[in-house]
Amino acid sequence: MIRRFRSRWIPLIVGARNFPTSLRISPKNTKAAKRSPQSKAMNPALETLALALREHPVAWPALFLGAEPHPDLFGATAWQPLKPLADLCAAAGMALSDEPQGKFRSVFFLPGKTKEETLAGFVLAHDLLALGGTLIISLANTSGAARFEKEISRAAPLLFSVSKNKCRAFAVSNTEPWDTAALAAWRDLAQPRLIPDTAFTVVPGVFSAGHIDPGSALLAQHLPPSLRGEVADIGAGWGFLSNAALAQCPNISRIDLFEADSRALACARKNLIGPAEFYWHDVTTGLPAKYDHILTNPPFHTGQARDIGLGHAFLTTAAKSLKRGGTLHLVANRQLPYEAHLVSLGLRPRVLEETGVFKVISAS
């Protein structure tokens, strides 16, 4: 079943539950560990976080921001804005919540890829941490672990730091007030903002949070005004392509936005006016309906690593979800060999424009 996403305007929030104060895994969680769909290559930052917890037990209940499944962490309330990872957490038996509320004796945090997202997460964690509580942050050395450890230690007392797996997990306490200037600066970063010279709202951590993606802008230039009927925007982000389609193509009866990042989808709801529906959804699992036209700027990275298979999965879903005579409109980096994959799916690709960086393709 596809869950239609509705969000309040706080990009990082979830509600507390009662959990045992012991760090040990309960029998229920042991069963969950056996059936966990955790990938073979576990996130090294997650492994380092679990190691830090074994070496430095903390009080519970706990909240896990940026959660991923791990047997030592199944007792934590999980917040995860990315649908594929949220689905893994749910399959492992973790309690998921859309908006964290209340206070937790411990908060665990696996930051995202950007500095702004990480610092915004610091202030969120502070606001959800009970007096005397512990915040543990874990990230890769190449993602700036040492820099962020230094940054947060200026605001709060550093408890410990554990280095392993080319990552670092470090902890601060809430036994005394944090530095107010640092909190104010981080809180400002966490606020929704407008992309310069536009009316589009974004938040830290979403794709293309500081500007309109040039690939999407190029695709928008090639959307024919004759587009009509039911349209899907897969990997819709904060809604730029859907907004362009509704503005340029008056005969669109409805556009459905499918996006894996709940924060981006919340932005899209603010950015669009018109006949649109919004779905927090993993596109690689398929779509619930067929469409006259599908728009996409498919992702080709999983985390920091290039993953052309992800782009292929998007195109496969699109091909299966087109009505007879329907058309796929996409933009991609010019070096990605998508044409052959489209042909293998029974579509006839046509390159409409190719620049030094991008290519726009129509396939039917």
Task: Give names to the regions the model predicted.
Residues R3-W9, R17, S22-S26, R35-S36:
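Low-acidity, Ser/Thr- and Arg-rich intrinsically disordered low-complexity segments
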Residues S26, S163-R228:
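SAM-dependent Rossmann-like transferase core, predominantly class I methyltransferases
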Residues R35, A41-A92, P214-T296, T302:
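Conserved SAM/SAH cofactor-binding pocket of Class I
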Residues P81, A140, L257-D261, L310, ...:
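Short beta->alpha hinge that forms the Motif I/post-I loop of the SAM-binding pocket
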Residues L119-L131, H312-R324:
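A short glycine-rich, Lys/Arg-flanked "PGG" loop and its adjoining helix->strand segment in the class I
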Residues G132-N141, G325-A332:
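Conserved beta-strand signature within the Rossmann-like core of class I S-adenosyl-L-methionine
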Residues P157-R193, N333-S364:
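Class I S-adenosyl-L-methionine
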Residues I294-A319:
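Mobile active-site "lid"/loop adjacent to the S-adenosyl-L-methionine
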